[in-house]
Curated annotation (Swiss-Prot):
Protein name stated in the entry: Ferrochelatase
Major place of residence: cytoplasm
Subcellular location: Cytoplasm
Protein species of origin: Brucella canis (strain ATCC 23365 / NCTC 10854 / RM-666)
HAMAP family from the UniProt entry: Ferrochelatase (MF_00323)
Lineage, highest ranks first: Bacteria, Pseudomonadati, Pseudomonadota, Alphaproteobacteria, Hyphomicrobiales
Length: 352
């Protein structure tokens, strides 16, 4: 038989055998990731959580030779008990978990329901620090047959300390795999109309429930060291942009809505103005009514419920203020879920 005849036979045989035995669509994973939470409020769980969090080089950029003796010699021997007492004040004792885990799970469940028109989409959630870990949930998505994954760091404003470290950990998990799925990561959305509108509606709804009208509304964001911003982290500018757009959407003046930064840690200068100092100054200057919201947090947690709802409120009232209200995060509200669903559907275009 000639070479030409052999080719003809092979082509004929190939033509009779379909390349794909079925038209089944490959699964697409959607992974929601938030900061994280301890598994409990006692010393052990708190120490494990803080050790993982404060060992992240994206979070603490100091030389390990300087930082580790401080971390393991001082911080992890003193801070777990104090942080545990704070967490205990907001702990969801019914489910034995922090509000962050409660709300993030609800967000995942509601997103899965909203995407039920896409049967090949699998929604799951993970935490950057603590459980469920990014690595374990990445494994689960791959085991379910996900050939493409959209990873959604749940941070409206980008920072290397938040969004970047989530992506770092995700790709670190994939480095151990033979098969690497196609990846998309949801970018920051500090100026997205659906997000600004959701914040505005949330503020309007909350203010309608109050017996007073706030003279000043603070948009309080988690701070980062000023040196990180000076080196090029766009976080501060994105926070200010969110506040500017929200202020315009609500028709407020610059004195009526101001951006501040909270949760500073350590001796370094952080982004200013500081939230705690601002509420104290407002009270001392005669402002009697204040409201605070946290646009950078998609779910209520220790930094919002306790640091703002309790500590900032106490600072304001103890220094002459009369009315203080914390505006809840978007959480799994209708407005909040519209933001998450809109951004996820946009990233799924061409994949489903």
């Amino acid at each position: 038989m000639s070479g030409t005849d052999k080719v003809r036979v092979n082509v004929s045989q190939t033509a009779q055998t379909p390349l794909h035995t079925s038209a089944k669509l490959p699964k697409v994973g959607v992974l929601l990731v938030n900061l994280g939470t301890p598994d409990g409020t006692s010393y052990g769980p708190m120490r494990r959580y803080l050790a993982e969090f404060l060992s992240d080089r994206r979070v603490i950029e100091w030389s390990r030779l300087i930082w580790y003796p401080i971390l393991y010699g001082i911080v992890l021997n003193t801070r777990p008990r104090r942080s545990g007492r704070l967490y205990d004040r907001i702990w969801n004792h019914e489910n034995n978990e922090s509000p962050l885990r409660t709300y993030t799970r609800a967000q995942g469940e509601k997103l899965a329901k909203a995407l039920s028109d896409q049967p090949n989409v699998v929604v799951d959630l993970a935490m950057r620090y603590g459980q469920p870990s990014i690595e374990s949930i990445t494994d689960r998505l791959l085991q379910q047959g996900c050939e493409r994954i959209v990873i959604f760091p749940l941070y409206p404003q980008y920072s290397a300390t938040t969004t970047a470290t989530v992506n770092d950990k995700f790709f670190e998990a994939l480095m151990k795999k033979r098969f690497m799925p196609a990846i998309r990561t949801v970018p920051s959305y500090e100026a997205e109309p659906v997000y600004i509108d959701a914040l505005a509606r949330s503020v309007e709804k909350h203010l309608a429930t109050l017996s007073f009208k706030p003279e000043v509304i603070l948009t309080s964001y988690h701070g980062i060291p000023k040196s990180y911003s000076d080196k090029g982290d766009p976080y501060r500018q994105q926070c200010l942009e969110t506040t500017r757009l929200l202020r315009e959407r609500l028709g407020l003046g610059e004195d009526e809505m101001r951006a501040t930064f909270q949760s500073r840690f350590g001796p370094e200068e952080w982004l200013q103005p500081y939230t705690d100092e601002t509420v104290k100054e407002l009270a001392k200057n005669g402002v009697k009514s204040v409201a605070v919201l946290n646009p950078g947090f998609v779910a209520d947690c220790l930094e919002t419920v306790d640091e703002i709802g309790n500590e900032a409120a106490e600072e304001f009232l103890e220094n002459g203020g009369e009315n203080f209200s914390h505006i809840p995060c978007l959480n799994d509200s209708e407005e909040g879920m519209k933001v998450i669903e809109t951004l996820v559907r946009r990233e799924l275009l061409g994949w489903v």
